[in-house]
Amino acid sequence: MARDEAQMELLFKALADRTRLRLLNLMAAGEVCVCFFVEVLGESQPKISRHLAYLRRAGVVSARRDGKWMHYRIAEPADAHAARVLSEVMTWLGEDHRMQKDRARMENICCAPSLPVRLQGAPRPAAVPT
């Protein structure tokens, strides 16, 4: 399989998983700490990290470490076709009712006056898509 074909297959496999779509949805407005993904999606940190690693391999997510916190954001794919596919997926996610519920849950958690104990000390996301 040619490199472009392999990358295209990886991208479509990355986008074919509901958890990964939910993660992309929550990153629509910017960088998010893993701990917020865990809280909003109600999944274990190892499961979330595995899905984020898959998205990184597909070239649609980038990461940075800040002390003990890992932050993820959507990355622009190098390939123009992949970038268009991701853009269309993000538009669809923005319009999907279930994804809007995830964004509302994120807003309720990160914008609450006090964070849940599990998130104490965690950096809040800069913005939450509404």
What does each model-found stretch correspond to?
Residues 1-5, 77-130:
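C-terminal regulatory/oligomerization modules of transcriptional regulators
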Residues 33-35, 54, 58, 111-116:
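Functionally engaged cysteine thiol sites
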Residues 2, 6-47, 53, 69-78:
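N-terminal helix-turn-helix DNA-binding core of bacterial DNA-binding proteins
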Residues 57-66, 73-75:
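Beta-hairpin "wing" of winged helix-turn-helix
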